[in-house]
Amino acid sequence: GFGGAEGLAAWLREHGVDAFIDATHPFAGTMSFHAARAAATTHVPLLALRRPGWAPGPGDDWHDVGSLTEAARLLPTLGRRVFLTTGRMGLAAFAALDDLWFLVRSVDPPEAPYPARTEVLLDRGPFTLDGERELLRRHRVDVVVTKDSGGAATAPKLTAAREAGLPVVVVRRPPVPEDVPVVADPEAAA
C-alpha cells in the first residue's frame, strides 16, 4: 500500500495529482477512509466510484445485517448448511458455529480460524446461474451469506437462492466517508 493516509498524501503531492478516484472494492473501507484523509490533507479533490449494490426483489428472503458477527449470530435461526461467500477474511466470526456446515467459496485459501465443519471451494467469478443452481443443490445448501458487493459477476447466487426459496444473509457495505461524492459508473465521473 501507500503507508496509510499519510503515505497516500505524500504520494499525491510527490506526483502532482490534481484529482483522484477511489475505485476500491465496496468493502475496502480502510482504504476509502485513508483516501478521504489524504484528500483532505492535500486539498486534492476525491470522488468515490461504487457500483450499485444489490436490491431484493419479489420472492427474495433477504436478511440485512451490519457485520459478519451479526450474520454469524443470525445463521443458526435460518439454516444448517451455509454457503458462505464473504471472502477469506473475516471467517473467524463464524468459527464457533460448530453445529453448522459451511461451504466457503474464496479466490484464495482462507486463513484460520474458521468453522470446523468447512469445505473450501477455491473459485473466481463470474459465475453462471446454472452453475450456482447446481452448487446449491449438490451441497444441499439451506442458507446463503454474502456481502453486498454489487455487480453481475457474483449475482447469480442470489437468483439461484431465490429460486430455491433459500434465505440470504446480506452484509451491508461500510459507508463511504462523509463529504466524498459518489458516482455509480465511470461516465458519471467525467
Name the predicted role of every residue range:
Residues 8-68:
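Glycine/small-residue-rich loop that forms an oxyanion/phosphate-binding "nest" at active or ligand-binding sites
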Residues 139, 148-160, 168-190:
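C-terminal functional extensions of proteins
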Residues 1-15, 122-131:
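Glycine-rich, highly charged phosphate/nucleotide-binding loops
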Residues 69-103:
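Internal active-site segments that recognize and position negatively charged phosphoryl groups
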Residues 18-19, 81, 142-143:
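Structural motif
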